[in-house]
Amino acid sequence: MTTLIASSLILSACDSQTPDTSASSEVLGTENRLEAENNGVPSDTEKDTNRFPASLTPIPDSYLTEAEQQGTLQDFYYDTYESFSYNEKSQRLQKHAVVYLPYGYDESKQYPVFYLMHGGWSNEYTYLGSPDEPHGMKHILDHGIANGEIQPMIVVCPTYNNTSPEDSGDYSLALRLTDNYHNELINDLIPAVEGKYSTYAEDTTPEAIAASRDYRAFCGFSMGSMATWRTFEHSLDYFRYFMPSSGGPAASTETYESVIKDSGHEWDDFFIFAASGTNDFAYSGFKNGIDAMRESDSGLFCFADNEAEGNLYYLESDGDHSGEYAMLYFYNGLCWIWR
């Protein structure tokens, strides 16, 4: 069995003291809150009861096979603009995402939305697959939702690829595209997705998207993690939850602290769940970045296994830089969020 190691540091809400390290082994407005409770999403007062585990929970083997109760995958097309000339809007592009709808999707209910970005040398099909050829992450969602481990949600797999499907294979280009991606994400993708499907956004204006940020998450592994950090940097007003793994951070702790201060958000307005593997080539830089946030005395990053007491948590495996471990990190984040 693969050994999974957790770096678990628990602090009370924004305690200024440096936490001890322990390791263990094992592979809203009122209306929105009421709607959330009716759909099984916890209210603010319930969040403290939902804690991350002390170590990463392995994905059951059966979750990699087809479930009896299956959600659906849909091809989703939307219009946007070429990344580097985005502000000029001189080159229109039609782009594609894969959208997962949970089993029993009901337009009379509202669903939180989980945006999942691929890494390098990849595309929007990498994790969920396609409607005709679903991949393992789709099966994991189906089983987790059916067994009550994962909250029913909409999952969107877009791409930062720009004018070519090969863009993600160029490392320096991919870095630039993930830094620019927030333009397309906020102005084009979210309004298109959340204007079509039943979410917590009352409409697709920037104000409504910001008002529904508690029910929106961004996640990614490797270059998708870089996109996640950039989303935190550029789009904190529109997302509450961020799940980077094995990539970045894309900027310094001081930069992120300035982002938080400038946004007007407090320490309890967001949550970051981060993960990596000790045999991952990105491990050292990634963990150093998390440690810098954890050790900051600004009071803006608070390490805890739940969002009532903090806004930052980190778990690690002994894994390498591979899709197997990416799905492990995603699964653990999905089992916690909105529960």
Predicted regions and their residues:
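Non-catalytic cap/lid and distal C-terminal segments of serine-dependent acyl enzymes
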Residues: 20-339
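Bacterial signal peptide processing site
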Residues: 15-17
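Bacterial N-terminal signal peptides
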Residues: 2-8
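C-terminal motif of bacterial Sec signal peptides marking the signal peptidase cleavage site
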Residues: 10-13
